[in-house]
């Protein structure tokens, strides 16, 4: 079960 991330990860550190 893969749930779409929302809000989407814009900044990734």
Curated annotation (Swiss-Prot):
Pfam families: Tryp_FSAP (PF08248). Keywords: Amphibian defense peptide, Pyrrolidone carboxylic acid, Secreted. Expressed by the skin glands. It comes from the Eukaryota. Its main location: secreted. Signal peptide: none annotated. GO terms for cellular component: extracellular region. InterPro entries: Tryptophillin. It is found in: Secreted. One of its GO terms (biological process) is defense response. Belongs to the frog skin active peptide (FSAP) family. Tryptophillin subfamily. This is Tryptophyllin-T3-1. It comes from Pithecopus azureus (Orange-legged monkey tree frog).
């Amino acid at each position: 079960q893969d749930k779409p991330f929302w809000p989407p990860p814009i900044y990734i550190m």
